């Protein structure tokens, strides 16, 4: 081919290419490829290189002929590679210095396992809606910061760009997302991969309570730990009360340890599709968060509160009451180890456990004080507890008889006959009044 090339003038070769409408001839020889500099409109050549996956030609052009194609050659190739779904070429171009921001704003969508939405099967690259387009039938794309509002049960994250230069492109803006009739799908990432979340956080995704619960449901422990670390480093809309309620131990302990009283909350407004920030300065209510941790069975948070903020967590009998009400055996064991009397309040704890059908806890308390069997026998009219001790699986909890209401039992704990007890500095419990803590020797040292 080289011999033939030199036998004919360049102008004739150009005429052959144009009249045959076959630009493939440009790619058969380096000499022919050099003719590109004589062609004014180079877009069809770029399109051909990308569409036909002429990867070696692309690499050669980047290395030796980039000036021939103009200043935006890399970005033109990048755009074409995204449109054609040649995503590995797009990655290569970005690695070589192509400006990814030339694609416009980055958006996200999440997809299911089949990547099918409203009977439309997504493909890499350009996706064009067929048929009537309106606000309900188009492709929904989201800003990175709000994508976590739309995780649902999806398993993949997709990069999305809007092909604004395409003929016929249309879009609507609704709340905080767009609806378009054309989108360009980039790389697919799995939502159970840690690197996916690092990528999302890098692009500004806001961590919400729903995000952490999504990762918990999918048993993504490393991702949960990473997200909590991110929350410790930056302020988001998960405060200490939510952390204690949901058992975000690392985050809750961070708040407690550092006595964070100024929390920055980013509020999300669905109707406007916006966030705004509100700095709230307030004293942490340690008694309240101790109760939240107890109600929801988060023993590590409670332990840290009791042992590090002992002067603030309040009456341990109230905490024991909540542990019995919600049936958290490990917390009850912990409180018993501290020295909490299980017979206080006219045996309110025993009755409360009976009412909640927590026979497993009553069985444990028998090892602490065998005399409570007399209380149990008084309410065990049909011998349900005896049956449980013989065969726990034989009991139907719907048959229990509850002699007292929770309100009645709570009154016993709050009555003068049950003097409040608190965890003291010397790792013990005592019955001093809460207001007397400032008088404890060495308390303010």
From Swiss-Prot:
The keyword Repeat applies. ANK repeats lie at residues 73-102, 285-314, 315-344, 346-375. Keywords: ANK repeat, Repeat. It holds the Pfam family Ank_2. The keyword Ribonucleoprotein does not apply. Disulfide bonds: none annotated. PANTHER family: ANKYRIN REPEAT PROTEIN (PTHR24188), GH09064P (PTHR24188:SF29). This is Putative ankyrin repeat protein L797. It comes from Acanthamoeba polyphaga mimivirus (APMV). The lineage of its organism: Viruses, Varidnaviria, Bamfordvirae, Nucleocytoviricota, Megaviricetes.
């Amino acid at each position: 081919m080289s011999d033939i090339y030199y036998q004919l003038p360049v102008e004739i070769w150009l005429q052959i290419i144009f009249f045959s409408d076959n630009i493939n001839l440009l790619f058969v020889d380096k000499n022919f490829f050099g003719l590109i500099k004589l062609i004014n409109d180079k877009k069809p050549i770029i399109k051909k290189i990308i569409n036909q996956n002429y990867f070696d030609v692309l690499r050669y052009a980047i290395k030796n002929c980039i000036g021939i194609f103009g200043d935006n050659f890399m970005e033109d190739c990048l755009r074409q590679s995204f449109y054609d779904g040649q995503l590995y070429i797009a990655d290569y171009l970005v690695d070589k210095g192509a400006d990814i921001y030339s694609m416009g704003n980055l958006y996200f969508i999440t997809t299911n396992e089949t990547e099918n939405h409203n009977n439309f099967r997504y493909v890499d690259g350009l996706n064009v809606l067929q048929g009537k387009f309106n606000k309900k039938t188009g492709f929904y794309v989201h800003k990175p910061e709000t994508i976590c509002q739309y995780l649902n049960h999806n398993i993949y994250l997709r990069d999305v760009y809007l092909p604004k230069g395409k003929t016929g492109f249309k879009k609507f803006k609704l709340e905080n997302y767009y609806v378009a009739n054309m989108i360009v799908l980039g790389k697919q990432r799995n939502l159970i991969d840690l690197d996916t979340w690092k990528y999302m956080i890098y692009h500004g995704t806001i961590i919400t309570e729903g995000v952490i619960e999504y990762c918990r449901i999918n048993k993504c422990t490393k991702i949960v730990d990473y997200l909590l670390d991110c929350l410790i480093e930056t302020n988001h809309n998960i405060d200490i009360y939510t952390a204690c309620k949901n058992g975000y131990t690392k985050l809750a302990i961070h708040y407690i340890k550092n006595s964070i009283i100024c929390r920055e909350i980013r509020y999300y407004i669905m109707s406007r599709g916006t966030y705004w920030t509100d700095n709230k300065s307030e004293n942490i209510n340690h008694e309240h968060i101790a109760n939240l941790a107890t109600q929801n069975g988060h023993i590590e948070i409670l332990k840290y509160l009791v042992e590090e903020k002992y002067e603030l967590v309040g009456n341990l009998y109230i905490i024991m009451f909540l542990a019995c009400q919600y049936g958290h055996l490990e917390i009850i064991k912990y409180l018993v180890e501290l020295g909490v009397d299980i017979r206080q309040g006219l045996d309110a704890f025993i009755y409360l456990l009976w009412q909640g059908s927590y026979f497993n806890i009553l069985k444990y308390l028998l090892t602490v004080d065998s005399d409570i069997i007399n209380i149990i026998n008084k309410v065990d009219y049909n011998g349900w507890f005896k049956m449980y001790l013989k065969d726990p699986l034989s009991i139907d909890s719907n048959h229990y008889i509850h002699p007292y209401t929770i309100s009645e039992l709570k009154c016993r704990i709050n009555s003068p006959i049950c003097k409040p007890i608190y965890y003291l500095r010397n790792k013990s419990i005592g019955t001093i009044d809460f207001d007397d803590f400032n008088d404890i020797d060495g308390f303010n040292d």
